[in-house]
Amino acid sequence: MSAFSEAALERKLSELSNSQQSVQTLSLWLIHHRKHSALIVSVWERELRKAKPNRKLTFLYLANDVIQNSKRKGPEFTKDFAPVIVEAFKHVSSESDESCKKHPGRVLSIWEERSVYENDVLEQLRQALYGDRKVRKRTYEQIKVDENNCSPRSSPTDPPQTMDLIRALQELENAASGDAAVHQRIASLPIEVQDVSLLDRITDKESGEQLSKMVDDACMLLADYNGRLAAEIDDRKQLTRMLSDFLRCQKEFLAEKEHKLEVRIVLF
């Protein structure tokens, strides 16, 4: 894996695209160099503010991937991102157009589900995205009002629009679990990276370095695929929630129309 430097990080951030592969590849590189986490976060924030509006959301996705996938190796990134992440969310939200503003909220929802940060940080993030429109606690009566207000005239976020569902389904057509090429690459990994008994074959420094490189390449491949699978699981959970909300509201809408039709029949 390439050596770390501030210039190398700046270059990689400038080349970052919004593809899942690009985000996860850079995330793995950053996690590998996590001893530089403070500098990485500083450069990330600086480059985020310099990035064009259509690239800012990708920086947030990168931070999400790094924070979540580095936790099992150490708290460095979670701790170093904490002082800047609220302002970063505000910045991305303010610079995004209306169609993209829901995406930071999706990242926040995942962090809430997984308790990525303490409640006080999550509350600050909620305030950064929603202001006073989304309070932390609601009464039972308020929740029931929200549930009963679902109709075709409701906000576009409740329920999801048909095009949002179609888009989510289309994105899953290229999901990691269906990537035959990666399946084949994993199946074709050399036996040397799977069987520890073959370590006895190492007879000199050169053969040891060759094996080390094979293991590193295999780890990169598997870590990348694991990250893609984790993202796919999140996408499928989100789609399940969207479908559930959509079906519930459609049933309520149908029941409302049937009731109105019955009233008309009685009147006539």
UniProtKB/Swiss-Prot annotation:
Belongs to the UPF0400 (RTT103) family. It comes from Gallus gallus (Chicken). The lineage of its organism: Eukaryota, Metazoa, Chordata, Craniata, Vertebrata. SUPFAM superfamilies: ENTH/VHS domain. May form a heterodimer with RPRD1B. Associates with the RNA polymerase II subunit POLR2A (via CTD phosphorylated at 'Ser-2' and 'Ser-7' of the heptad repeats). It is found in: Nucleus. Interacts with phosphorylated C-terminal heptapeptide repeat domain (CTD) of the largest RNA polymerase II subunit POLR2A, and participates in dephosphorylation of the CTD by RPAP2. May act as a negative regulator of cyclin-D1 (CCND1) and cyclin-E (CCNE1) in the cell cycle. GO terms for biological process: mRNA 3'-end processing; RNA polymerase II promoter clearance. It comes from the Eukaryota. The gene is RPRD1A. Keywords: Nucleus. One of its GO terms (molecular function) is RNA polymerase II complex binding. This is Regulation of nuclear pre-mRNA domain-containing protein 1A. The keyword Nucleus applies. Its main location: nucleus. PANTHER family: CYCLIN-DEPENDENT KINASE INHIBITOR-RELATED PROTEIN, REGULATION OF NUCLEAR PRE-MRNA DOMAIN-CONTAINING PROTEIN 1A. One of its GO terms (cellular component) is nucleus. Residues 1-133 form the CID domain. The keyword rRNA-binding does not apply.
